[in-house]
């Protein structure tokens, strides 16, 4: 997805959030704030985005958004239980209506047989108690994996929570 397409998708998400009077927050690890960056590239985004969290280390995940150390130790940072706790923690900390969390292995190192480079976990949560998780395995270099993860996060937020609702 090109920068222009990411911008268009972000604008679409922003318009839907603004129409609902809703806000979104992000908790990002492997994307390093890229989702928040794309959101804030849109003029007027302060109407639907107040804050995001870049929680790259396990310590940051625990300190900033309340991911339990036991969860990190048992499952590892790139796991469904961790992204769920990231999304719920960000939702509470930001007092937002929607949260998107992302944790993955962008590469080129860090992969394993169980979690190869390109593995990314996502969680999406709402203040109404709804939520979904997704696991994707993207291909390409580090930049490509991170770009695909950013696009996937925005697309899924749009398709699962904002489109036709």
UniProtKB/Swiss-Prot annotation:
EC numbers on record: 3.5.1.42
UniProt-listed GO biological process terms: pyridine nucleotide biosynthetic process
InterPro entries recorded: CinA-like_C, CinA_C
Keywords, ordered alphabetically: Hydrolase, Pyridine nucleotide biosynthesis
Catalyzed reactions per annotation: beta-nicotinamide D-ribonucleotide + H2O = nicotinate beta-D-ribonucleotide + NH4(+)
Pfam family, one: CinA
Top-level taxonomic group: Bacteria
Enzyme class: hydrolase
Field pH dependence: Optimum pH active over a broad range of pH values.
GO molecular function (one): nicotinamide-nucleotide amidase activity
Complex formation: Homodimer.
Function: Has nicotinamidemononucleotide (NMN) aminohydrolase activity, not active on other substrates.
Recorded family membership: Belongs to the CinA family. PncC subfamily.
Protein name (Swiss-Prot/TrEMBL): Nicotinamide-nucleotide amidohydrolase PncC
Species of provenance: Escherichia coli (strain K12)
Gene coding for it: pncC
């Amino acid at each position: 997805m090109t920068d222009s397409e990411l911008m268009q998708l972000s604008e679409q998400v922003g318009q839907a959030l603004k129409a609902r009077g809703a806000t979104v927050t992000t908790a990002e690890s492997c994307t390093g704030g890229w989702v928040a960056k794309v959101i804030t590239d849109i003029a007027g985004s302060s109407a639907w985005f107040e804050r995001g969290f870049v929680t790259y280390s396990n310590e940051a995940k625990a300190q900033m958004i309340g991911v339990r150390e036991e969860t990190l130790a048992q499952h590892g940072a790139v796991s469904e239980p961790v992204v769920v706790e990231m999304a719920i923690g960000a939702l509470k900390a930001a007092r937002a209506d929607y949260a998107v969390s992302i944790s993955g292995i962008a590469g080129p190192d860090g992969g394993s047989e169980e979690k190869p480079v390109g593995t990314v976990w996502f969680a999406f949560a709402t203040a109404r108690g709804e939520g979904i998780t997704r696991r994707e395995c993207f291909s390409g270099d580090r930049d490509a994996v991170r770009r695909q993860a950013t696009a996937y996060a925005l697309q899924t937020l749009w398709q699962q929570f904002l489109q036709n609702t």
